[in-house]
Regions:
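Extracytosolic ligand-binding ectodomains
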Residues: 1-185
């Protein structure tokens, strides 16, 4: 947040130099004066402001839990991308356990590949069958004065997981899919 504050101190607004952040979300904006941040952007796989039935249910469940447990901020409960990712992960694990009919890790791991879940993003997330990374949508949101985001761009659907960046020299020759013929140690 100090970076944004300094931009404001220098008289630079989002209309002059828009900044795209990859780690600023609803929780980071809680309790912060968002006026100087309005118009800056963030890229995530989920924003609380998304409008769809799955997100409405997700926010309602979280608000009830936060109130019941008397969590800090329960009077104005927030959801964010890391929470949505955890929520998806727990449900996919549950589905994999049910498919494997076991809690045994060696049985659950192969069962998790290919799992799908209608996520709070409004899209169906998918666990890649080979590398176990999620296929998820991408959203770009513009910071609003109330600390929420207005989605200004989104992918038409989930983006296939690419676990190794080709832009990092050490990763350029890494395979996105594990070698299933390699022997376990």
């Amino acid at each position: 947040m100090p970076f944004y504050k300094e931009l404001g101190n220098q008289g630079l607004k989002a209309t002059d130099v828009p900044v795209v952040a990859f780690s600023v979300g609803e929780e980071e904006l809680r309790g912060v004066d968002t006026k100087p941040l309005v118009g800056h952007l963030a890229a995530w796989n989920y924003f609380m402001s998304l409008k769809n039935p799955e997100n409405d249910a997700f926010k309602k469940k979280w608000a009830a839990y936060a109130k019941k447990m008397k969590l800090p901020g329960a009077d104005k409960p927030l959801t964010n991308d890391p929470m949505e990712a955890t929520y998806i992960g727990i449900y996919m694990w549950k589905q994999a356990v049910e498919k494997a009919k076991s809690l045994d890790v060696d049985k659950v791991i192969p069962a998790v590949g290919g799992q799908t879940f209608k996520a709070p993003s409004g899209f169906t997330a998918k666990m890649d069958e080979k590398n176990h990374h999620l296929h998820k949508p991408v959203f770009i949101g513009e910071i609003k004065a109330d600390g929420q985001f207005n989605v200004v761009w989104k992918t038409p659907g989930p983006v296939k997981a690419k676990p190794w960046s080709p832009f990092i020299p050490e990763n350029k020759d890494k395979n996105d899919e594990p070698d299933l013929t390699a022997k376990k140690k």
